[in-house]
């Protein structure tokens, strides 16, 4: 009986979170990412966007997965020549703690150690965020994407420094406009 009550309660919580639709809106000219739930901005973040020659793609996309403690492999691009791969948790890993693909394989939202770049057009096309902000955003995306996790799960992820890919039950829409 207790198990049935717990399962029912868990399903109701998931349905409640899923019913409140999250969408992300990125304004490239304002260098801002808004998290919008049921038409209301619930979080607003300053971001870095693509610079001249490496613009952030515009359009409507979906986030289908969240990757915690991602490794970084230099892309096959001129700017990345001579750079070496960085494992999860490495201080020089430009992805930092989490990344969320919006246009695979090369464009994602991720943390940055270069906080001076926030509010600027400084990236190679990705959307960079402060580490605390991107962590909060990834938690929102997982919650509204049907994969909420308890706080101890996140503590383990941060402590272990191993890559964990979370596929969302419900992709989260993101619109990027100039």
Regions found by a protein language model. Name each.
Residues 71-77:
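Short acidic, Gly/Pro-enriched loop/turn segments at secondary-structure junctions
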Residues 5-14:
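Bacterial N-terminal signal peptides
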Residues 69-70, 106:
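Short, charged/polar surface micro-motifs in flexible loops or helix N-caps
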Residues 19-64, 68-69, 150-178:
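Intrinsically disordered, low-complexity
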Residues 70-71, 116:
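Short, acidic Gly/Pro/Ser/Thr-rich loop/turn segments
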Residues 58, 77-178:
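Exported/periplasmic cell-wall-interacting domains
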């Amino acid at each position: 009986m207790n198990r049935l009550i717990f399962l029912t309660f868990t399903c109701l919580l998931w349905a409640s979170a899923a019913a409140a639709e999250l969408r992300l809106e990125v304004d490239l000219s304002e260098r801002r990412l808004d998290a919008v739930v049921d038409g209301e901005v619930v979080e607003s973040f300053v971001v870095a966007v693509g610079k001249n020659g490496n613009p952030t793609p515009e359009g409507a996309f979906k986030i289908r997965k969240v990757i915690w403690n991602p490794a970084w492999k230099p892309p096959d691009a001129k700017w990345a020549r001579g750079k070496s791969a960085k494992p999860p948790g490495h201080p020089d890993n430009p992805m930092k703690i989490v990344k969320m693909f919006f246009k695979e394989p090369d464009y994602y939202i991720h943390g940055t150690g270069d906080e001076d770049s926030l509010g600027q057009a400084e990236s190679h096309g990705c959307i960079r965020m402060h580490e605390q902000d991107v962590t909060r955003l990834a938690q929102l995306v997982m919650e509204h994407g049907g994969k909420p996790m308890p706080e101890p799960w996140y503590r383990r992820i941060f402590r272990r420094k191993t890559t964990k890919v979370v596929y969302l039950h419900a992709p989260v829409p993101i619109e990027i406009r100039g």
